[in-house]
Amino acid sequence: MKFLDLAKVYIRSGAGGNGCVSFRREKFIEYGGPDGGDGGKGGSVWAEAVDGLNTLIDFRYQQHFFAKNGQSGMGRQRSGKDGDEIVLRVPVGTEILDEDEETVLADLTHVGERVLLAKGGNGGFGNLHFKSSTNQAPRRANSGQEGVERTIWLRLKLIADAGLLGLPNAGKSTFLSSTSNARPKIADYPFTTLHPNLGVVGIDNTEFVMADIPGLIEGAHEGRGIGDRFLGHVERCAVLLHLVDGTSETVAEDYRTIINELEAYGGELASKPRVTALNKIDALDDEERAEARAALEAEVGAPVLMMSSVSREGLDLVLRAVRAEIDDDRLRIKQAEASEEEDTPWQP
């Protein structure tokens, strides 16, 4: 299935049905009075996060979603039928943006979560509603309320515990395939990975989800290479695993390139916890390892882990470091939720 993480959608809720002007007509009843029914409500447009979807590709082939109008009222106090609503089924992790692509209308992060995008119009009143002591035979009825028409954007941000970062050919896909059941495309050329991949990684009888995104290059925030739009898929991650190619002659510059792109992207991505690892050490001798590690640690300003996805050397240490950061993040979230509950005043 093709991957699509951004889609433009046109939606319109249904208009309400018109009220009816009608009078009771029965034998031997000379003054039957009004009996016009109300119009039905127009259908609303909803979005719902569902399980089993991981792409917005369906919205490439259908961009217009129009709910049904409510039917008009009828005589004998019969109300019109309500219009059928429409539900947009989206993957978990979908953000719904206004037409400006900046204003976030909703963020669906749980299965079954729903949000109302466009409310259907109310039905008009029939003439029965306008009967009074001074007007026993009203000949007026309300028109139905118009529906709401708008343009929205759907943007998918995959939900993972950890995200993989690095230049093209840093070994991210090989790492994911070595540590999980994911089978991303692997080849010895840049930009082998063209869309994000998810894998469930296990270590010490615990599991977490890791996302592999296409590699970044210098100037990605300006659209070079594949660009930086896939960085949105690691915004929700608790920790970022930054892989640096140990066979490169410029490991420090490679590391700085990715950090600069994170800072240019903005948001909280640059300040997220990071684990930095020097990859492909199976291709280096002891002297080359020490030299590359020293250069990278001087740039990072912190200890750097050594690993190889092929020989699996140091792999468990890297996974344990990532897992520790995930546990710390979950603990911080629980503490924040507990403090919010304490600050909430008691209500009877």
Swiss-Prot record:
PROSITE patterns the record matches: G_OBG, GTP1_OBG, OBG
Cofactor(s) recorded in Swiss-Prot or TrEMBL: Mg(2+)
Main localization of the protein described in the UniProt heading: cytoplasm
Entry-linked InterPro entries: G_OBG, GTP-bd, GTP-bd_Obg/CgtA, GTP1-OBG_CS, GTP1_OBG_dom, GTP1_OBG_dom_sf, OBG_GTPase, P-loop_NTPase
EC number: 3.6.5.-
Obg domain boundaries: 1-159
Molecular-function GO term, any one: GTPase activity
Binding-site residues for Mg(2+), renumbered to this chain: S173, T193
Locations listed in the record: Cytoplasm
Residue stretches making up the OBG-type G domain: 160-327
One GO term (biological process): ribosome biogenesis
Any Gene Ontology CC annotation: cytoplasm
Binding-site residues, GTP: 166-173, 191-195, 212-215, 279-282, 308-310
Superkingdom of the organism of origin: Bacteria
Function: An essential GTPase which binds GTP, GDP and possibly (p)ppGpp with moderate affinity, with high nucleotide exchange rates and a fairly low GTP hydrolysis rate. Plays a role in control of the cell cycle, stress response, ribosome biogenesis and in those bacteria that undergo differentiation, in morphogenesis control.
Subunit-level organization: Monomer.
Protein name: GTPase Obg
